[in-house]
From Swiss-Prot:
GO molecular function: ATP binding; glutamine synthetase activity
Reaction(s) this enzyme catalyzes, per UniProt: L-glutamate + NH4(+) + ATP = L-glutamine + ADP + phosphate + H(+)
Annotated EC: 6.3.1.2
Similarity-based family: Belongs to the glutamine synthetase family. Type 3 subfamily.
Name of the molecule in the record: Type-3 glutamine synthetase
Species this protein is from: Dictyostelium discoideum (Social amoeba)
Keywords annotated in UniProt: ATP-binding, Ligase, Nucleotide-binding
Coiled-coil intervals: none
Keyword Metal-binding: no
The protein's enzyme class: ligase
A single BP term in Gene Ontology: glutamine biosynthetic process
SUPFAM superfamilies: Glutamine synthetase/guanido kinase
Length: 735
């Protein structure tokens, strides 16, 4: 082991958990008192706004109705006074451009009038509602040129403003949308809000026309399970690949990985739990209802998850959570990795999106009745979702097509790249009975008898959990498991909202058309049955990891798009352009720009990885191998006189064999690395992002895998003290 790595290990061994600035014995820091205290939500508004203003802004937040400009100044003043009491000196419009990160520009509250040296603290309604950042400096997919810089941020009143606390002050952050001067959406939030409105309207009309239910708003809800790795910061900084790419580009399989199955739900390391506890307190102050935390399957991997929230708020909270996890982990001497596959040979990370639809009265539209077979409303929404996923599986796959997910989807740790739906035995029986015109037998609710005296019988859930399915029904929601851990959740949710809304409209119109010639019940049964017959092919309740499923999916006509370039190609198909433009979610220009940006992100990510790998091998791995090679050669040469003097020495000279293996492996690594460099140089010859992505996927990535193969082999035979970077056995297990 190198002296440097030994120093890291000794340092890590001496580290103690870092205490957060929270004293839970103090009443002011109790959860019930501090929850939501750093957001300008309804509680803070009630205390700072006039009654009529509060009622109006509450209506805006709860129903999504338009904000009256006349009350904007009152809201801005109340927000400013509240923020100043929280220690804020600056405010910012906090928005989500198309680069996958949050963006903000800080402005202080201070104002000075001409001829008056007195400083005033001001914040107007116009400053609250509208900002003007440079739109040309963010990814736009061609919508904005460098000389077309004007863009606008617009307050999203449905998502509360919040305080971000730093060591030397606080900032008032105002969630906003971001658009160009010509009106195109340049962010992740705007189309999400549009899609929420679309699915709300289509659900309201469907419930009114077919079930005589009256609602003002239906909200898509999300519960987001965030997975991540926490590793020691010293190991991270000693790995250029982790610093540059967020994942390791080399690294031999350690003697122990996750095969003992001892990490999942295991007792948390004290440094780790101290870090996560501080994150929880910060998120609770921001009004995020974090509920669970636990060790995940891979060593060093963890998960936190909140209670369901309205989709746009859940999306904002997830971005805030990722940001706070990064910052707090640094304080604790750790680094939080969100890459989908930071380490080869152990499970990668995802971000399961639990999606449902909730009425303004609090009812879950995906909650079956006493039994699913008795609930026509549930069956209609279920049928609409089945149809939506079948027709638009390509879009769902594209919505999770990020570079890191290529390493995860399709492996025996995550859902396959084939999009299918898992319903469970009970619902599958109901669906087949509808299709086959057989009587629907209500299964009733069974109990599980654990066979232990003193243990009560436990009610069985109506569905099992199928972790191999990318889109699974789990009792009262659908769990979209293919979303990558590093992703902004907005685009997958936009797609889901949009395709379900379109499907609801189609089925409703078909039923209403059929009702002109038959009874309501007959029309309902016919259209539901016909729709299920046409789209039930997407339902699969078996093992998604099996090779048989790939063959079966192919026979059913389901697409298998394992690579990111393949998945992104279909985004701007005629079908998808029509879907988004007719629903006013994304114009053809906005959709094409997103496809272009996703290709750009993929290409830049792979090129960074390829260059990082070449440099890592050239400047760290090969010098270590040369030194080891020299040591072996000198050692073997030093014993040559002895070997030559032993005429009866009959044993094969394994030392020569070992030297030959090292020399050959080093030669192969040099050759592979030079081939990689040649391919990197070829990337400059491409004018199309699409064709470049295909080249990177089919040529550069396979060559990177070749380089890694030889490097990892050498890691296993080069003297440990000579190896230049921390190994998996150290990074994954030492905290």
């Amino acid at each position: 082991m190198s002296n440097r790595r030994r120093e890291f290990i000794e340092y890590i061994d001496s580290r103690e958990p870092v205490e957060a600035d929270i004293d839970i014995s103090d009443k002011a820091d109790r959860l019930t008192d501090i929850y939501d205290s750093d957001t300008y939500g309804l509680n803070a508004m009630r205390e700072t706004l006039p009654s009529h203003c509060y009622k109006k802004i509450r209506e805006v937040m709860q129903t999504g109705s338009a904000l009256d400009p006349e009350i904007a100044d009152m809201v801005a003043n109340g927000m400013k006074e509240w923020a100043i009491k929280q220690g804020a000196t600056h405010y910012c419009h906090w928005f989500l451009p198309l680069n996958g990160l949050a963006a903000e520009k800080h402005d202080s509250f201070i104002s000075i009038f001409p001829g008056d040296d007195k400083v005033l603290l001001e914040f107007s309604g116009m400053q609250l509602i509208k900002g003007e950042p440079d739109a040309s400096s963010f990814p736009s997919g061609g919508i904005r040129s460098t000389w077309e810089a004007r863009g606008y941020t617009v307050w999203d009143a449905t998502s509360p403003a919040f305080i971000r606390r730093e060591k030397n002050g606080a900032i008032l952050c105002i969630p906003t949308a971001f658009c160009s001067w010509t009106g195109e959406a340049l962010d992740q939030k705007t189309p999400l809000l549009r899609s929420m409105e679309y699915v709300s309207n289509e659900s309201i009309i469907t419930l009114s026309s077919l079930f005589n239910e009256k609602h003002k708003r239906i909200s898509p809800t999300l519960g987001i399970e965030q997975e991540f790795f926490l590793i020691d910061r010293k190991f991270y900084l000693a790995r250029p690949d982790l610093v540059n790419c967020g994942r390791t580009l080399i690294g031999a399989k350690p003697p122990k990985g996750q095969e003992m199955e001892d990490h999942y739900f295991g007792t948390m390391n004290s440094r780790i739990i101290s870090c996560i506890q501080e994150v929880e307190w910060k998120m609770w102050r921001l009004g995020m209802p974090l509920k669970t935390r636990h060790n995940e399957v891979a060593p060093g991997q963890y998960e936190v998850a909140p209670i369901f929230e309205r989709a746009n708020i859940a999306a904002d909270h997830n971005m805030m959570l990722m940001d706070i996890l990064k910052n707090v982990s640094t304080k604790h001497g750790l680094v939080c990795l969100f890459h989908e596959k930071p380490f080869a040979g152990v499970n990668g990370s995802g971000k399961h999106n639990n999606w449902s639809l909730s009425t303004d009265g609090g009812s879950n539209l995906l909650e079956p009745g006493h039994t699913p077979s008795q609930n026509a409303r549930f069956i209609l929404f279920l049928t609409a979702i089945i149809r939506a996923v079948d027709i638009h599986a390509d879009l769902l796959r594209a919505s999770v097509a990020v570079p890191g997910n290529e390493h995860r989807l399709g492996a025996n740790e995550a859902p396959p790249a084939i999009i299918s739906i898992y319903l469970g035995k009970e619902l599958d029986t109901v669906i087949n009975n509808i299709i086959n015109n057989t009587d629907i037998q209500a299964p009733g609710s069974d109990d599980m008898d654990l066979g232990v005296v003193g243990f009560p019988p436990l009610p069985k859930d109506s569905t099992d959990r199928n972790r191999t399915s990318p889109f699974a029904f789990t009792g009262n929601k659908f769990e979209f498991r293919a979303v990558g851990s590093s992703q902004v959740v907005n685009f997958p949710c936009i797609v889901l909202n949009t395709i379900v809304a379109e499907s609801l409209r189609f089925i409703r119109e078909e039923i209403l058309r059929e009702m002109k010639v038959s009874s309501r019940q007959t029309a309902f049964n016919k259209i539901i049955k016909d729709t299920l017959i046409q789209h039930v092919r997407v339902v699969f309740n078996g093992d998604g990891y099996s090779g048989d499923w790939k063959e079966l999916a192919k026979s059913r006509g389901l697409a298998n798009l394992p690579s990111t370039p393949e998945a992104l190609t279909n985004i701007n198909s005629e079908k998808n352009i029509k879907l988004f433009s007719e629903s006013n979610i994304l114009s053809p220009v906005e959709l094409e720009s997103r496809q272009e940006i996703l290709f750009e992100i993929y290409n830049k990510s792979i090129k960074i990885e390829a260059n990082s790998l070449y440099d890592l091998v050239s400047t760290l791995v090969l010098p270590a191998c040369f030194a080891h090679q020299k040591n072996i050669a000198e050692s073997v040469n030093s014993i040559m006189p002895f070997i030559q003097s032993q005429k009866s020495f009959s044993q094969p000279n394994h030392q020569y064999s070992h030297l030959s293996e090292v020399v050959e492996s080093v030669n192969l690594l040099i050759e592979a690395n030079q081939k990689l460099l040649a391919l990197i140089k070829q990337t400059k010859d491409f004018n199309s992002e699409h064709s470049l992505a295909t080249f990177l996927n089919q040529s550069v990535i396979p060559q990177m895998n070749e380089v890694r193969k030889f490097s990892d082999h050498l890691e296993g035979i080069v003297e440990d003290k000579s190896w230049p970077v921390p190994k998996y056995s150290e990074i994954l297990f030492l905290r």
